[in-house]
Amino acid sequence: MKRILICEDEATIREFVVINLKRAGYDVVDVDCGEAALATFEAEHGNFDIVLLDIMMPGIDGFTVCKKIREKSSTIGIIMLTARTQEIDKVSGLMIGADDYITKPFSPSELNARVDAIYRRVCMSFIK
């Protein structure tokens, strides 16, 4: 099954993302902070296809989580999901290892399309 780890500190947004991705057929694990994302990633031995990360969170931010996950896995898809819309933030996220960058607000169709696109790339990396 397609597995996604979601790290978002805003409960309303996290629930919205979880519901939409479950409806799209994904197995979703959600956490509310960077520390929990890293702990869950470790506990699950990196057994996720995609990680969705907010950037601005209490404690460890999404950029740091992205960097640490990317150090452990070059094949997992990482999508930044954030209100930060400045070009410098987008470029920074992509430079440290994110595969895509979605700015809030976003629609369910945009979220699903971007997640599906990253999932296809992740699957293709295993076929090669």
Give, region by region, the residue ranges found by the protein language model.
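Short, Lys/Arg-enriched segments at the junction into DNA-binding effector domains
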Residues: 2-3, 117-128
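Acidic, metal-coordinating helix/loop segments flanking the phosphotransfer/catalytic sites
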Residues: 30-50
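Conserved acidic carboxylate
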Residues: 8
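The feature encodes the CheY-like receiver
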Residues: 58, 86, 104
